[in-house]
Amino acid sequence: LRSLVGSEMCIRDSLYTTRDDAWRPDTLWLHRLGTPVADDVKLFHEPDEKYWLGAGITRSRRYLVIAVGSSITSEEYLVDLEGDLTAAPQIVWPRREGVEYSLEHAVVDGEDRLYILHNDDALDFELVSVPASDPQGDRHVVLAHEPGRRLLGMDAFRDFATVEYRREGLERVGLLDYATDAVNDIVFDEPLYSAGVSGNPEWHSPFLRLGYTSFVTPGTVYELDLATRELHLRKQVAVLGGYDPLDYGQKRDWATASDGTRV
């Protein structure tokens, strides 16, 4: 048996990764159902032992994304799932030491676009979009690098995208409008909290599932109604012992360090 890593991804046939002697995922294979394993096709191999290999499917189900990365460097490739799976993967951005990036696929005005979150000359990360047909072409800046606003993640859906970021210690979620590049924060009642996008596998859904917690609110799952912008409580961790959040308060005090930094 081959040394398998992770789970198989069923896309017309089956894709899987195998590992080397150091248990490093290094090779992506295509298995056609009903054929011998000996006939499996090697789609990609990463020889550099500093890099691990992974693969996934965009939420749109349009592209296979092959991701190669180390702790500080990324390189990603695309395979069009509507075409030949054995065609040479299309490189997005060639690897450069110290540059990390991740991508999402969206369709904007009928055009396939890649939204790329990266730290190329952007310590707190920047969000750009490029044509999927020419990822190394002109970059359209969606969210410019802004010191103090750390972009954490982006998820693309059919009609909008989510942007997760941290500012002044709070992790927040905003909704990105493809047409205007405007980001509108999802508003919560508490002044201090941590919020993030939860599992949302569907390309098009009327609801967005969110994870939420604070110093006084236990782990909570909300669904945001995208039409009304109303939050609906779906699940919350029970706290034993007669806990009442109204018996507690939370606040944040700032101090100024000797170099002028607020902490």
Annotate the PLM regions.
Residues 1-6, 11:
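Single conserved hydrophobic/aromatic residue that forms the stacking wall/gate
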Residues 12, 60-62, 111-112, 158-159, ...:
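Short coil/turn segments that connect the beta-strands within blades of beta-propeller domains
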Residues 16-22, 26:
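Short, conserved, GDST-rich strand-edge loop motifs in beta-rich repeat architectures
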Residues 25-69:
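Polar, glycine-rich mid-to-C-terminal structural blocks
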Residues 31, 35-47, 82-94, 135-144, ...:
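Blade-edge beta-strand/turn elements of extracellular beta-propeller
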Residues 51-107, 152-153, 164, 170-176, ...:
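Non-catalytic accessory segments flanking enzyme active sites
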Residues 87-146:
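Extended hydrophobic/aromatic segments used for targeting, binding, or gating
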Residues 127, 161, 221:
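Hydrophobic, well-ordered secondary-structure elements that form the walls
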